[in-house]
UniProtKB/Swiss-Prot annotation:
The keyword Nucleus does not apply. It comes from Thermosynechococcus vestitus (strain NIES-2133 / IAM M-273 / BP-1). Gene3D superfamilies: Ribosomal Protein S4 Delta 41, Chain A, domain 1 (1.10.1050.10), RNA-binding S4 domain (3.10.290.10). Pfam families: Ribosomal_S4, S4. Residues 90-152 form the S4 RNA-binding domain. Belongs to the universal ribosomal protein uS4 family. GO terms for biological process: ribosomal small subunit biogenesis; translation. Part of the 30S ribosomal subunit. Contacts protein S5. The interaction surface between S4 and S5 is involved in control of translational fidelity. GO terms for cellular component: small ribosomal subunit. One of its GO terms (molecular function) is structural constituent of ribosome. One of the primary rRNA binding proteins, it binds directly to 16S rRNA where it nucleates assembly of the body of the 30S subunit. Keywords: Ribonucleoprotein, Ribosomal protein, RNA-binding, rRNA-binding. This is Small ribosomal subunit protein uS4. It comes from the Bacteria.
Amino acid sequence: MARYRGPRLRIVRRLGELAGLTRKVPKRSYPPGQHGQARKKRSEYALRLEEKQKLRFNYGVSERQLVRYVRKARRVSGSTGQTLLQLLEMRLDNTVFRLGMAPTIPAARQLVNHGHILVNGRNVSIPSYQCRPGDVITVRDNERSRRLVETNLQNPGLANLPSHLELDKSTLTGRVTGIVERQWVALEVNELLVVEYYSRKV
């Protein structure tokens, strides 16, 4: 399944707030569609599917990518759900977003794809690059790149900088100081339901 490129507010109405996907707030609080306002009890499968979709749409990953992350998380000792969230949170596009250098994850992905972002002084144009403690994230030294990021920093997508990141606005430099902790994940999601969803599929 390819990355979603359709109307973002429809997704937010169906799944709830997704800070990584869009900053816009839907006018209607109920899900889209003819029967959006009807309340009916959802099955356990539907609940698991919804939590999985939250991850997919918030982080902008394809179904195939998410399956790979689940497999990778299972190979690590500890909580599979928390490891899965850490893998998604430590992606370069999400890190650029959490630093405030882009208003959304799709916008951060575009900055990375277009070569505006450097990691440890090298051009990294792969949004899925896994950031590690010690990585230094800077903006390419040209006027257009700096102007883009400076504008975004004036109105970041999320107000609070997570504890594993540092930002020097004067030099447009971000540092990864550790691995993200669960309480800093800016998404209301039950990761255990996501793991359960994939338990028979992966």
